[in-house]
Every structure is written in C-alpha cells, then in structure tokens.
C-alpha cells in the first residue's frame, strides 16, 4: 500500500495549500479594485460628456445669434430698397430670388441651431447626469454582492483546509498501526523458527525422559506463543480501526476538494460575469438613447439645411437671362413697350399720304429701288459675316463663363496630414496666376465682342431703314411679288419655310440616296469604308446652306464620302430615327424566331410612330433593300448594312449592356431591311414619297426637292413661252442649269479679270444664267466665268426673246393663247421651252459621261384614247414629229426625249467641238433669273429668219433617218418610241454638233410645234429611282406662264433661288450708246464692270 504521497510531509502540503489560498485572496482584492476603477472612469466619462455638450450648446447658441444678426442686417437692407414693382412673387427676378432664398436659408439655420442648443441643455445633458447617478448606485450594490461571494469562497477554502488536516492525521495513525502490526508478525515468525531449531538439537535417550522434556518445552512454547498471538490480535484490531478512519478521512477530503474546485470555477466563470453585468445594468442602453437623441437632432438640422440648399440649387438652375428679360419688360411695360407709330402730318392742306409713282418720278423710283436692292444685297452679306464673327465670339465668352470649376470636393478629403489640404487649396481656382490670365483673356474677348455687336447693330439698323424704303417703293411700283433677301440674322423667307414644312424627306437624305442609286449600287464596301472627311464636311455645309451639291448627273464625288454624309445626317439627329420609347418593344420582337411573325410585330410597334418618321423609314429601308440586292458587287448584304446603320438609327438607352443590346439592334435592322415591304404601310395607307428601285424615266419621286414632269394642262401649239416687251423687262427668265443656252461671239474679247472669259469672234459659248443686265454666267473651252452681253448673240432664244420691244415679239406675244400653262421645270426654267434639239444635244453631253455598261431605255406612256384632239394610239415607226397626242384629262408624265432620242449620230452631226460644254452640276433648286435682255439687231434677226429653209431641210432629213433606222432595227420596241441611248453612244462619234446646226435644229423644232416637256434635272436621262406617290408634290414655283399681252409673270411661289441683282450707274443714253454697244456696229463696245460674286450661300 505504498504511495508517492507518503514521501511528502504534512508541512510541505499545508504550506503549498496556504500559498495557493493566499494568491486567491489577493486576486479577489484586485478584482474589487478593478471594478472600483471602472466605476470611476465611467463617472468621469459621463461628466466629460456633460461638459462637452454644455459647451457645444453655448457655441450653437452663439452661432444662432450671429446668423440671425447677419440675416436681419441684409433683410432690413432689402426691405428698405425693395422695388415696389417687384412686390409680387411672380415678378421677382431669378438672381433676386436666389438672394432671398439664401437669406431665408440663413434664418432657417439660425433657428435650427438655437433648437439644437436647447436640446443639448435640456435633453442630452440631463440624460448623461442620470446615467452617472444610476451607474454609481448600481456599482455599490454590485460591490456588496461581490464581497459576500468572496466571503463564501473563503469559507469553502477554510473547510477544505480542515478536512485536509484531518485526512493527514488519520492517515498517519493508519500508517503507524500498520507498522506495529508488521512488527508483531515478525516476532511471531521468529518464535516459531526458534522452537524448530531447539527440537532438532535435543535427541531423546529414553521414552520417559523424552516425555518429560516434551512436556516442559511444550509448556514454555505455549505461553510465549499465546503472548505473541494476543499482541498480534491487538495490533491487528488497532490497524483495522485506524485504516477505516483514514479511508473515511480521505473520502471527506476528496469530496471537499471537488466542492472547493467547483465553487472557485463558479465564482470566476459565472459570478464575476454576473457581478460585472450588475455594474453595467442599463448603462449602455441609457448611453445609446442619449447619443441617439444627439444624432436625431443633428440629422434633423442636416435635413433642414439640405432642404434649404436644394431650394437654392433649384433657384440657381433656374437662373435664365431670357425669362428675366421678359419678366423685366412685362413689369415695366410702360417703359419698354413700343411707342405709337409716326403718322403722316399733312402740311397746309396736302392730303396725299402715299408715294407718288407717276411718270415724271417713276423712273427715279425704279432707279432708286434698284440701288436700294443692290445696297441691301451687299449689306446683308457684310452683316452676315459680322454676325457669324459675333456669334463665334459670344460662344467663346459663354465657354469661358460656364466652365465647370465649382466642384471643391478635393478640398474636403480628410487626411491626418494638413499638407495635402493646404496644397489642394493653393492649387484651386483662386490661384492668382491662372485667375489673372483668365480674367485678362475674358476682358479682351468681351471687348472684341462688343465691337462686333456694335457693328452688327449699326448694320442691322441701316438694313432696316433701307429695307423699309425698298419695300415701300416696290409696293408703290405695283410689282406682283416682293423680292426676299437673306437677312444678316440668317432668317429664311416665308416661301422657303413653307417649302421646308412640306419636305417630308429631308433634302440631304433624298439627294444622297438618289446619287447612290444612280452611281453607287455596285460600289464595293459602301457605308463601310470611310470617305474623305474634308469632302464630307464640304457636302454637309452645302446642304446646310440650302444647296444640293449632288444635283444633276455629274459623278465627280467620292461615293464613300456621300455615304458618310447620309450616315452623318442620321447620326447627328438630336433624337434617333427609332425613338427610345419603342426600344424595349422592338427588342422583344427580336426574340421571335419566325421572321414573318417578327415582321408583323415590328410593324405593330412602328405604326405607333408619327407618320413623317414612318415615311422616312419606309424610304430609307426600301433603298437599303435595293442596295443589298447588289451584295455580290458591293459586298454589303442586309447584315452588313445593319451593322453600319444599327448604331446610327437606334441608340441603346443608358443602363443597358451596350454590347449585347447592339447585337439585337443589328438583327432588328437586318429584319426591317429584308421585310420592309411587309413592315411599312404602302402609299395608299401612308401618303408620302416612295422609293422605287428604277423604271421608266417618267417615274419619279414625289419629293419637294424635285418637280414631277407632269403636264398639268394642254400645252399650246408651241412650247416656247412668249412675253411681250413689257414682260421681258420685268419678268425673270430662268434657265435650267443642266440645259445651257448657246451663244455666238460678235467680237473678240479679252477678259480684264480672272472672272471674265476671253474669246474670239464667231466662237460658240454656253450661257448658264443672267448675272445682270450686262453680264452672263457661262462657259468657254472648259472655263467658267462672266460673258459680256454686248459681245454675243444668243442663238437659243425663242423669237419672243429676240429683243426687247421688237415688233416680232409683240406680234407673237399677242398671237399665242393666254389660257395654256406648262408645269414642268424645263418649260418654266429654260428659255427654249420644249425645243427638242436642245434637249437632245444637252443630253448627249450627259450620256457621254455615263459608264457604257449601263443599259438605259426610255419609254413614253400610251396616251389614253378618247381624248379630244388625240390620235387613237402612237405608232412606233412613222409618227410625224408634230403628231404627238396631248392628254389634257389624265395629266400623264411625258418623256421629253420620246421622239428625238431615236436620232443617231449621223455624219452630218459630227462636227468639231470647241471644248467640253457640260457645266459641273450645281445645286438643284437654284434656278437662274434672266431679265432686261438687250435688243438684237434687225440684221441678225433677218439672217436667222433667212436660214429657216435650211433648218426645215435638216430636220426632215434627221426624221427620215430616224424612221429608216427604226425599220432596220432588230430590237423589238415597246408600244411607245424607245431608244437605247447606250447603243447610240457605242456606235456614234464622240463630238457634239456645232452651233449652226444646233440653231437650225432648234428653229425646226419650233416649227414642228411639239408639246414636249423636259423632265426635272437629269431624271429623263436614266432610269429614275423614284415613283409617284399618292400625294401631290409641291408645284414648281415657275410652273405657269401666260402669254397674253400685258400679262405678268405669275408665280404661286418665288424661284427656289435667285441671284442677287447688281445695279450699275445708269448710262447717259437709253439707246445704242457706245458704252452699251450696238449689234450693228463693228466696233466692240466698252464692257461694263463685272458684277460682284453672287452669294450662293444664302437661299432666297
């Protein structure tokens, strides 16, 4: 029963136990001290919070009082100086409104901070005081409980000490009893071993003696054994008793030890935690409520301040000069309203209150009106340039003053170092070098702006005065139509605005599509390859000026640049062609797999759009579908076109994935291109221009930019429109720029400037327009410039225009019918009217520039039977030149070249050409004005009349050849007269007829009296890509002319453009003065000064 514990003495064990108990007692004392310290820190913290908020309340109150004083100071000043006119709120100017809101915000902040101070003093500070009191009371009670727990723990430790000492005592008694028992057992063993050895030493000699010895020894051994046994039994009983007591003491010690460990664990793990919880009871919750009260107060102050700042922000955003100007003028209406007009004050009974235009002063008024007109043209151009400079300067100033440098967020970045804040502030807007430089630039720009503004206003004042005088004189003279000018402000006249209002297809879109349809369907990579940015900008600027740089058949533009202009137009729209409102509906259509069902759903969505947008979409996608059918050549199938036009026509709204949505957009555009016919309504359902893939030249686009070649009324016997001498003086004579007039030089002339052409006597010149009374715009040997009127004889002029005041003009002017009108552009804009030879020769120039791979055919629609004066039908081969039927009821389009297009390049027509006589195309719609023609010499007239027989012979020969060629032709022609122009070009020569033959052909065409009309521009030279819509397009402004004696040139609308007339000093003699020249003299006249350059940037 040995154990390691027996080797430790009682004193060692008791000393170790006492040391452990001593450490526990010291730890308990430290615990109470720590809790005392925490209580003191808590009380100190609460006291500091009270002092902080007390001081903050004082600061908030002082701040509130200072803000109130600041607001009252300026409010009193505002009330003292307030304008009585602005007492009503609606009359307050926006800057004053900002100032009032700023002062109101200061007063609001003053009240808010006073409320905040009151909350600090009367709400938050008492909360902290109450928390401090509660914490002290709870700590005292918790400390009492802690002391009681420590006393109980020490009692348990003392009980353990007593039980342990009892265990040690009983265990020692047990050990002693055990040692004594072992000693008795050893004695007994010794006794037994001694008896055995004694018996072995004595040998018995006789039985009697042996018996006696045994008895004696037996008696002695028995007495000693009994003693030993008794002693052993006694010690055994003592050992057993002490052993039992030791076991019981050890059990009690183990139980007490376990109980003591449990009490210690419970105290340290649970009791201390509960004790601390008692100390903290309600402390954190109360502190949380106090701080939330503070936060609520601060947040409400911040909310109030933010609301006021939002009000000021809205007022700042509403700072607008125009509204303040309007409000100011309405408030002071009596100051800013225009005064009464100045009325004519008769003097001494003079009751005439209007201009007098009787014969003595009529000439002076006419001359003055022309001078005013010329002066206004110059002033408008100058003032327009000044205005452009002024607007550019104003934009620069606005950029300076609207720079967004008001964000000071960087200055409020919190950092532990103050150096970063200081550096940010030092580099801010108010840095002296940059500020001084900006101020200097701004002042310099402002000075320049005011200089230009003063110049512009002075020029506009002068224009206003001269315009008023001109209008009154023009009204007095009784002219039928007032000449409109482009004012320096860039405003357009009412006629152009009306035309623009009915332009469903924008000019830029219609012209680009027309050009691409004619020349670019086979162009590889169209819309995908970028064009020249310079040329794109030039074409775009020309369109913005109201011109059409793509008019005519000239193919001298880069196709990629024109495609870029078309895409740029749609990309530059403020709102995309497909509105964002239908984006999601259209995207949902893309998910439909069936293309037919998808097209039906797309149609439903697009029908909700305005009709003008639908017309443009229908026009554009019909063109793209047409273009995609040439994908083998141009490599642009519907998908490639969709990739090019998708981002341009439909923008992806913000908040959507641009990449994924763009793929759906492209798929949508591709579907619309393929199924455009089923998606967009037809012309019966939706009126407007319709794109056509091609066809006969009489098919056209019903567009505001191109007048359809319709015969509105029956044409007279001769298509040339004759004016009497008075009409020639006043009515404008225009020429289609694609069909110039030919003239013959009467004298040698050497140009004095680069603008004037030089030529020899007898040279042939092409005339495009009348620049003034004394000058023409023309072309000679490939050079364009000015041609003096006195040096030439106009060959293409009809007899009615042979001279002003000629008897022949008067006679024929009175002879023609006054009830017939011609609506085509050619008849209204060309001085030769329906001269077929002129049409033929002009178109040869155009066709020479065409690619020979294009097969172009022309047909004439069959004339309806039953029309009055019409033949039953048109015969293909033997139709006489003057035998065309006139359809007055159906107003069908007529091909201007239906007869003479069959004339081949005969050897009699092959003559030398002086130079290329095709002028570079200029914008359509810019017709030229001709007026005040100089009279031709009667000798020249006689020479022209003398050659009429030759003209008739030549014309008959040409028509005979036409019939012979038609009989020999193996090609099956249409019911109308058809000519393959390309085959003629391949088989014929490349030269064009000289001027004498040209003149004879024109005279013969007049005698044949054809009612033929020329189509607009070059629409008759190739298959048109446009077809008529159900709606009636706007008529040409030059659609009707009357030939009655004394009739005037009547226009429903003024010409699209008209060159600004130039007035020169009046010559000394009205007749054939040397300065003006005479047709019969052999001495060349002195040419007048050339006119200034015509302003082609301002549409009239």
Curated annotation (Swiss-Prot):
What are the Basic and acidic residues biased-composition ranges? 181-203, 807-823
Residues marked Arginine finger (site):
528
This chain's function reads:
Postsynaptic RAC1 GTPase activating protein (GAP) that plays a key role in neuronal morphogenesis and migration mainly during development of the cerebral cortex. Regulates excitatory and inhibitory synapse maturation and density in cortical pyramidal neurons. Mechanistically, acts by binding and deforming membranes, thereby regulating actin dynamics to regulate cell migration and differentiation.
- Signal peptide residues are none
- Indicate what this protein is called per its UniProt record: SLIT-ROBO Rho GTPase-activating protein 2
Organism (species): Danio rerio
According to the entry, every stretch annotated as the F-BAR domain falls at 19-324
One Pfam family this chain carries? Answer: FCH
Keywords of the record: Cell membrane, Cell projection, Coiled coil, Cytoplasm, Cytoplasmic vesicle, GTPase activation, Membrane, Neurogenesis, Nucleus, Postsynaptic cell membrane, SH3 domain, Synapse
Q: Which InterPro entries match?
A: AH/BAR_dom_sf, F_BAR, FCH_dom, Rho_GTPase_activation_prot, RhoGAP_dom, SH3-like_dom_sf, SH3_domain, SLIT-ROBO_RhoGAP
Q: Where is this region: Disordered?
A: 181-210, 800-835, 852-938, 986-1100
Which residues are listed as membrane-spanning?
none
Q: Where is the composition biased (Low complexity)?
A: 1067-1081
Which residues, by range, are in coiled-coil regions? 170-201, 363-400, 945-972
SMART domains given in the database record: FCH, RhoGAP, SH3
Question: What are the GO MF terms of this UniProt record?
Answer: GTPase activator activity; protein homodimerization activity; small GTPase binding
